[in-house]
Swiss-Prot record:
Lineage: Bacteria, Bacillati, Bacillota, Bacilli, Lactobacillales
Protein name: Probable tRNA sulfurtransferase
GO BP annotation list: thiamine biosynthetic process; thiamine diphosphate biosynthetic process; thiazole biosynthetic process; tRNA 4-thiouridine biosynthesis
Keywords, alphabetical: ATP-binding, Cytoplasm, Nucleotide-binding, RNA-binding, Thiamine biosynthesis, Transferase, tRNA-binding
Family: Belongs to the ThiI family.
Encoding gene per record: thiI
GO MF terms held by the record: ATP binding; CCA tRNA nucleotidyltransferase activity; tRNA binding; tRNA-uracil-4 sulfurtransferase activity
Chain sites annotated for binding ATP: M183, L184, H208, F209, R265, G287, Q296
Length: 405
């Protein structure tokens, strides 16, 4: 079946009142970026839904991209028909023959924005229902919870028919909730936290700490590839690489073993806050889950958060590890996350870190190092790269990865 357009129904936009138009405008921009590889499309955002005219572009490929755009409740591939009931009958029958298995229940649901059309919604429902009952007597009309709905939209230019409704990504259009920094490690949790941030409309930038020669180029490439895994939801994400070797060596030399992780995390948070403020970010996201590791007890979080007044948001804080893994598998980051490349969070990890560090002790040990100088030098070495979904960073590591797995 050759579809004419895809009809998009908005998600939570219906609750946004006076800001609705701004939300629709942002969604329109996000959809346009997501579908930029299909130049013949015409995208028409309306108050209650969006119409994407295919103009010959492949509907399956367009819908695959569309399914990853946040702010969409669902969408339907539709066929445009002239406002001639004989032609509407013919296309409706063809559509049902191709999509409705024998013996299922269905109903006709008509919406009419063209009130000059001869048939109102009830008359249209009855007309098409009678015709289909005559031509497909195996189908059962059922008004409540049918197996299939034949949706009909009567508009000025044509009548649109559809039988499929495909679930969208939900959430809010990315960018409508502001911009934030995400502390991205190479693990399972932080990409999932990034996914949830995007779903709530937050435009994220990745902050990743890199400690050569203790961490490898493969580890850096892995973090960039994890970023690329999330870009289909937004179009592009900035990856901010922060050199962290000198800081880790200084902490290792001057801070007692039990407080290494706490002070290291405090410096990471200080640097992330500084970068976020420079770039106009409103909050910091991370992948911490309460009690999962020593640095993620409430006492550790309190001692680490002490260095910032910026909001710290933890989308996976109350999730079990199995729940986080299931979400990582769903968004296709899990296999990449478990590749065994060391990140800077693990290379100097003490065997027995404090699970209940004291904030005053963390401050004291931190005072033993030149925080200002270390931060200045790290910030001077920051590298920023724009990452898109088509970018590949792991190709050069294929043989190594295959051997490791």
């Amino acid at each position: 079946m050759q579809y004419s357009e895809i009809m998009v129904r908005y998600g939570e936009l219906s609750t946004k009142g006076k800001n609705r138009q701004a939300f629709i405008g942002r969604l329109n921009g996000n959809v346009t970026r997501a579908l930029h590889e299909f130049p013949n499309l015409t995208i028409r955002p309306k108050r209650d839904r969006m119409h994407i005219e295919l103009n010959g572009e492949p509907s399956d490929q367009v819908m695959a991209r569309l399914s990853q755009v946040f702010g969409i409740q669902n969408f339907s591939p539709s066929i445009a028909v002239e406002k001639d009931m004989d032609k509407v009958h013919a296309v409706a029958l063809q559509l049902m023959n191709e999509t409705a298995p024998k013996g299922i229940s269905y109903k006709v649901n008509t919406r009419r924005s063209d009130h000059d059309f001869a048939l109102d919604t009830n008359a249209m429902n009855l007309d098409l229902g009678d015709y289909l009952t005559d031509k497909r007597p195996d189908l059962v009309v059922k008004m409540h919870q049918p197996d299939m709905i034949l949706r009909v939209e009567v508009r000025r230019e044509a009548i649109y028919l559809s039988t499929k409704t495909i679930q969208g990504a939900g959430g809010l259009p990315v960018g409508t909730a502001g911009k934030a920094a995400l502390m991205l490690s190479g693990g399972i949790d932080s990409p999932v936290a990034g996914y949830y941030a995007l779903k709530r409309g937050v435009d994220i930038e990745m902050v990743h700490f890199f400690s050569p020669p203790y961490t490898s180029q493969q580890a850096l490439n892995k973090a960039k590839q994890l970023t690329a895994k999330l870009t289909p939801y937004v179009g592009r994400i900035y990856f901010i690489e922060v050199p962290f070797t000198e800081i880790q060596e200084e902490i290792k030399a001057k801070v007692p073993e039990g407080y290494l992780m706490t002070v290291q995390r405090r410096l990471m948070l200080r640097l992330t806050e500084a970068i976020a403020q420079q770039r106009g970010d409103l909050a910091i996201f991370n992948g911490e889950s309460v009690g999962q590791v020593a640095s993620q007890t409430l006492e550790s979080m309190a001692a680490i958060n002490d260095v910032t007044t910026m909001p710290i948001i933890r989308p996976v804080a109350t999730m079990d590890k199995n729940e986080i893994i299931a979400e990582a598998e769903k968004i296709d980051t899990y296999d990449l996350s478990i590749m065994p490349f060391e990140d800077c969070c693990t290379i100097f990890a003490p065997p027995s870190p404090k699970t209940k560090p004291k904030t005053d002790r963390a401050r004291y040990y931190e005072s033993k190092i030149d925080v200002a100088g270390l931060m200045d030098r790290a910030l001077a070495g920051v590298k920023i790269q724009e990452i898109k979904s088509s970018d590949q960073f792991m190709n050069q590591d294929q043989d190594v990865i295959a051997e490791l797995l």
